[in-house]
C-alpha cells in the first residue's frame, strides 16, 4: 500500500490517497491504464455534530508523471459537505482514475 498525504489549502483537512498496488512504468508504452478503484480517505478535525462534516472528497483533477521507476503526481480537491457515517471522523469514497504519460 502506498499512502500519500495531501494537505488542503482551503480547510483543516488532511487527505490520504491509498493506492492498492505498486505502480510500474512501462517505457515501451506511452499509455498506462490504471482504471483501478482506490479509497479516498478524508480526515477532518471538525466535529461531526450532528449530521455532517466539512470534508474534502471531490477529486477535481489528477495528473501523474511517470519517469523510470519514479512516479510523482499532484491532485487538486474541492470542498463539500458530506454526511458522517459510522465513524464520525472518517469518510470513504470509491474512485477510479486513468494514468496517461
From Swiss-Prot:
Protein name from the UniProt record = Putative uncharacterized protein YER137W-A
The protein's UniProt keywords, in alphabetical order, are:
Signal
- Source organism per entry reads Saccharomyces cerevisiae (strain ATCC 204508 / S288c)
Keyword Signal listed? The answer is yes
Print the miscellaneous field. Partially overlaps YER137C.
Task: Respond yes or no to whether keyword Signal is given for this record.
Answer: yes
Q: Where is the signal peptide?
A: 1-25
Domain of life, source organism: Eukaryota
